């Protein structure tokens, strides 16, 4: 049997018996940076496309392409300090992995759902004071179909990004009435995520647009 090494963010005396506190883990480490044998253009991972326009294929991404995806979104999207992001998409999809990397770079807090459930999503939004996230249009639609969803507190949410399918204007307007901006993004596995992004200012004026190319 193989056991996963668990790190706890609590103090030594508050950690569970099966976990090592983060402070103790760091204290046992060397202050000298280890040598890194990886180069910028070395392969980082292979991610498979969804097969929307053909058979799924493996896309090779390097450290450089992954970081440029991060830099592009970070420079153009409406990221703010103290961001609290809900991650609903599966981690094998570029629409989930790239935002996770962006949040780590930005210093944002990411709440990862094991699987999408609209009720659990609303509970997370309310409990963790979520400010943003990325969902496909169907997820956004499921969210407002939850019975009595109006009873949840979503006042912390500033905006949700969406993509992978056309977004009905009525759905965008529904969220705008709730005080939540819906901004469309268009991306590809081949571009490590971003290709086009609509800014929040124009998302109301042009709700059917996914914005300008980067």
PLM feature spans:
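Structural core segment of the AMP-binding/adenylate-forming
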Residues: 1-27
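Short beta-strand->loop structural element characteristic of the AMP-binding/adenylate-forming
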Residues: 1, 57-60, 87, 109-115, ...
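Conserved AMP-binding A3 loop
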Residues: 44-68
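Beta-strand->loop->alpha-helix junctions that form or flank phosphate-binding loops
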Residues: 5-13, 183-190, 210-213
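Gly/Ser/Thr-rich phosphate-binding loop
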Residues: 105, 122, 130-135, 144-205
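Conserved AMP-binding/adenylation subdomain of ANL enzymes
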Residues: 67-84, 92-132, 145-146
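Short Gly/Pro-enriched turn/cap motifs at secondary-structure boundaries
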Residues: 35-37, 208-214
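Conserved pre-ATP/AMP-binding loop-to-beta segment of ANL
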Residues: 13, 26-48, 55, 78-84, ...
């Amino acid at each position: 049997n193989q056991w996963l090494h668990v790190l706890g963010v609590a103090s030594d005396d508050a950690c569970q018996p099966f976990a090592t506190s983060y402070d103790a883990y760091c204290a046992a480490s060397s202050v000298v940076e280890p040598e890194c044998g990886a180069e910028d253009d070395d392969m980082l991972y292979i991610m498979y496309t969804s097969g929307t326009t053909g058979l799924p294929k493996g896309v090779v991404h390097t450290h450089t392409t992954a970081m440029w995806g991060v830099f592009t979104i970070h420079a153009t999207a409406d990221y703010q300090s103290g961001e609290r992001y809900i991650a609903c998409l599966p981690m094998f999809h570029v629409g989930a992995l790239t935002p996770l990397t962006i949040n780590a770079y930005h210093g944002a807090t990411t709440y990862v759902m094991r699987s999408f459930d609209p009720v659990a999503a609303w509970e997370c939004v309310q409990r963790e004071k979520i400010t943003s996230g990325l969902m496909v249009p169907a997820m956004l639609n499921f969210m407002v179909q939850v019975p009595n969803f109006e009873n949840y507190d979503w006042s912390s949410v500033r905006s949700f990004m969406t993509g992978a399918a056309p977004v009905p204007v009525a759905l965008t307007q529904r969220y705008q009435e709730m005080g939540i901006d819906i901004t469309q993004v268009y991306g590809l596995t081949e571009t490590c995520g971003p290709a086009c992004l609509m800014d929040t200012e124009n998302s109301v004026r042009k709700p059917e647009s996914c914005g300008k190319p980067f």
